[in-house]
Amino acid sequence: MPSIFAYQSSEVDWCESNFQYSELVAEFYNTFSNIPFFIFGPLMMLLMHPYAQKRSRYIYVVWVLFMIIGLFSMYFHMTLSFLGQLLDEIAILWLLGSGYSIWMPRCYFPSFLGGNRSQFIRLVFITTVVSTLLSFLRPTVNAYALNSIALHILYIVCQEYRKTSNKELRHLIEVSVVLWAVALTSWISDRLLCSFWQRIHFFYLHSIWHVLISITFPYGMVTMALVDANYEMPGETLKVRYWPRDSWPVGLPYVEIRGDDKDC
């Protein structure tokens, strides 16, 4: 059995040809397509600084984890090692768990918690730790955990979309879902239609997934920030802005605070 540190010790291999450009980098494009994580992470920390000061400084942890995902993903695609796969998936799990803890509206908490966020954070932390430990024994556990969280987030977003009349929030949800759907299509196509893409010499769908998901996450985070503000920041008005300019057709969203606890 190969070492978990060894090149190509992971059972996962993507459609891109291995070691095509360097004997040190297994998947060249899949490795370097993670660079946007290191650009958007610090930029979003800067743009969201006033909001984080008001809401919670733990928001910075989310963006640090976002950059760690980029780092571990680079390591995984560079080596295709089992350790790299685990680190990549575990970092995603902790990112989602952190976002859950900060932005999950209390009305979606399990009823036995009575809307207590501190207890909810403990529950999420314990669940994430257990899932992390189990992933070393059974790597498929992480996949189930990630899919469960993703489906629950999608459910919450759909519920909030139905309830809100806020045009900015509805627009953000629509853009986030479209970006996520296109990114997921790229990921699935790379996995299931690899033989077709190899025949036409197009190996870049997983790289496109990296770029799209690195853009989708800021949209998703700002979406959850707006949803959260409805319940946790009464009296504050959040305005969605876009970097570098609001007038540009494409931009990176963030919230500006310009300033009725609400029920689900």
Swiss-Prot record:
Topology of the protein relative to the lipid bilayer: Multi-pass membrane protein
Top-tier EC class: hydrolase
Family: Belongs to the alkaline ceramidase family.
Activity regulation text: Inhibited by sphingosine. Activity is Ca(2+)-dependent.
Gene Ontology biological process: cell differentiation; cellular response to calcium ion; ceramide catabolic process; epidermis development; keratinocyte differentiation; regulation of lipid metabolic process; response to alkaline pH; sebaceous gland development
Gene that produces this protein: ACER1
Catalytic activity: an N-acylsphing-4-enine + H2O = sphing-4-enine + a fatty acid; N-tetracosanoyl-sphing-4-enine + H2O = tetracosanoate + sphing-4-enine; an N-acylsphinganine + H2O = sphinganine + a fatty acid; N-(9Z-octadecenoyl)-sphing-4-enine + H2O = sphing-4-enine + (9Z)-octadecenoate
E.C. designation(s): 3.5.1.-, 3.5.1.23
Protein name: Alkaline ceramidase 1
Source organism per UniProt: Homo sapiens (Human)
